[in-house]
Structure formats: structure tokens, C-alpha cells
Amino acid sequence: MRSASLISIVDDDESMREATEGLLRSLGYQAVAFSSAEEFLKSDSIDNTACLIADVQMPGLSGIDLQYSLSARGVQMPTIFITAFPEEGSRKRAMTAGAVGYLSKPFSEESLLKCLDSALGNSR
């Protein structure tokens, strides 16, 4: 059930962060948004997050650095990376870090849902 799935969104772009959070809530997901990787790492949401959506390029820790930091702490969660600057090298690094999806901004609702369904083990 979607309402049981907490999706954490980490993006320094306020409009993207709010739009993604609003979309997920409208689809029945619990969603919480953070403006930086550091803010997410300090939060109580880590242990409850079913899927992480993280911007690749952010000030401070990047989304990929966030994924490595979580792994170093022994925290494993499906991660979907989003980026306004799609580059093959970045995509490869994201997938190596364990990404279940890599989307270029702007992405479609359908693309995001497909990645989420895969991350959460849902079938459509």
C-alpha cells in the first residue's frame, strides 16, 4: 500500500523538491523533503525511508556522496537519482553506488512512478 511507504526527497532546488513532494503525496505516498544531504543525514527519517530520491548535484554532499555515506553507516535503501545535468559518467557512478533509477530533469510522472514501483517492489 502506498501510504505505508515513506519517500524521502533530497534536492537543493526548492521548486523541484516541493513539486516532487506534492506529486508523491497526491498519489498516496508519505513524502518528506530535505534541502540538503546533510539535513537528511541529521533527520529521524533515515530509518523509516522506504525509498530515497536524491539530486545528483548539490552544494555540500552530492546525492551520490549521500548514497555512499548511507552505505558506510550500514543503511541500505533503494535510491533514485535525479539530475538537471545528465552525463554518462555521473549515471555510471550513480548505478555503481546502487541506484535503482536515474532520471533527467524534467522527468515525467510516469518515469518517476516506474522507478518507484521498481524500488518498492510494486507491480503496475
For each predicted feature, which ranges?
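Alpha4 helix (beta4-alpha4-beta5 surface) of REC/receiver domains from two-component response regulators
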Residues: D65, P86-G101
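C-terminal output helix
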Residues: G89, F107-D117
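A short, hydrophobic beta-strand element within the central beta-sheet of small alpha/beta folds
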Residues: Q76-P86
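Receiver (REC) domain active-site loop signature in two-component systems and cognate sites
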Residues: M58
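Acidic, metal-coordinating helix/loop segments flanking the phosphotransfer/catalytic sites
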Residues: A33-C51
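Acidic catalytic/metal-coordinating carboxylates
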Residues: S35-S36, S62-D65
